[in-house]
């Protein structure tokens, strides 16, 4: 029996385990049920913040040319700049903040008229206040991030459990870029940022991991039901390699996602807070991670009541 929506390899592993138990217990394996899919990812507008555009005319900007922001703002205001992806808007806004902040901390303001000095201060304070929200939007508005949680996915295959290191590096870079957003000495790298986002775009990894946890929980509960009905005294040894790999990979990934979110110094939108709590939490008993751990612990406890059959 192959379940729709799951890779054959994963189903085969669980079916083999159920069959192994059935043979040892001299019983028929329980009927397998397909676990529910993960929910639809929240709509973009519910995940991002509205950022007010800067409304300074180019003549006023030119008056601040000593801050070297004229060409930067002109590039942002042209047609290509207005349709740039969120990641490039993030780079632009951070560079603009760096220029304004650096300029304010030089003797340039003293050379400006009072009106232009006030304008420079207002722009600097405005961009300082906006940058954390721009940083958030850059991640959560990106197609790469949203694709990671796509329902059009399958549970993470046991053959690809070891292939998540590049994606973990991508999350770590986004986290470090967020942590250093107000560090004028930290140099951003457009090519590196885009390569990491490209890595996240390769596959819906968050969805694959969540669905793998749901599948494992379902199969473990089914196996536990078989043990509840058993009269045998011993069980064959259980190779837990695949389960332990899933446990390790899922914990690594969910921890990295939560660390990235927590690196932002602002309260996330309510829609994200709900999704994170219900699906990505490592502490919520009703989230996939804790459900999986409970199912695994319950099954191991039931197995411990049996001796290991001699080979």
Regions inferred by a protein language model and the residue ranges of each:
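C-terminal motif of bacterial Sec signal peptides marking the signal peptidase cleavage site
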Residues: 3-5
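N-terminal Sec/ER secretory leader and immediately downstream segment
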Residues: 10-159
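Generic hydrophobic, helix-prone segments enriched in Leu/Val/Ile
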Residues: 17-21, 100, 213-225, 275, ...
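Cysteine-centric signal of extracytoplasmic or virion-exposed proteins
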Residues: 67, 103, 234, 309-310
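Alpha-helical interaction segments
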Residues: 87, 126, 135, 243, ...
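Extended amphipathic alpha-helical interaction segments
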Residues: 123-265
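Hydrophilic extracytoplasmic domains
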Residues: 251-311
């Amino acid at each position: 029996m192959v379940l729709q929506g799951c890779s054959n390899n994963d189903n085969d592993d669980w079916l083999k385990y159920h069959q192994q138990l059935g043979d040892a217990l001299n019983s028929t394996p329980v009927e397998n049920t397909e676990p529910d899919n993960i929910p639809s990812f929240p709509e973009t507008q519910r995940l991002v913040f509205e950022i007010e555009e800067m409304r300074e005319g180019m003549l006023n900007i030119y008056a601040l040319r000593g801050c070297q922001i004229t060409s930067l703002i002109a590039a942002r205001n042209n047609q290509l700049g207005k349709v740039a992806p969120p990641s490039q808007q993030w780079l632009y806004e951070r560079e603009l903040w760096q220029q304004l902040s650096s300029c304010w901390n030089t003797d340039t303001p003293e050379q400006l008229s009072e009106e232009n000095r006030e304008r420079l201060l207002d722009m600097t304070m405005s961009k300082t206040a906006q940058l954390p929200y721009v940083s958030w939007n850059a991640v959560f508005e990106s197609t790469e991030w949203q694709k990671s949680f796509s329902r059009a996915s399958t549970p993470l295959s046991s053959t690809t459990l070891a292939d998540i290191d590049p994606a973990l590096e991508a999350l770590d870079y986004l986290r470090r870029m967020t942590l250093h957003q107000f560090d004028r000495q930290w140099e951003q790298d457009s090519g590196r940022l885009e390569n990491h986002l490209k890595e996240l775009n390769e596959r819906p990894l968050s969805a694959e991991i969540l669905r793998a946890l749901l599948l494992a929980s379902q199969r473990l509960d089914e196996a536990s039901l078989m043990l509840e009905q058993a009269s045998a005294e011993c069980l064959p040894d259980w190779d837990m390699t695949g389960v332990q790999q899933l446990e390790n990979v899922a914990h690594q990934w969910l921890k990295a996602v939560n660390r990235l979110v927590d690196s932002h110094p602002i309260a996330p939108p309510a829609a994200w807070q709900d999704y994170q709590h219900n699906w990505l939490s490592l502490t919520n008993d009703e989230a996939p991670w804790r459900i999986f751990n409970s199912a695994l612990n319950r099954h191991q406890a039931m197995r411990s009541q049996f001796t290991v059959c001699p080979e």
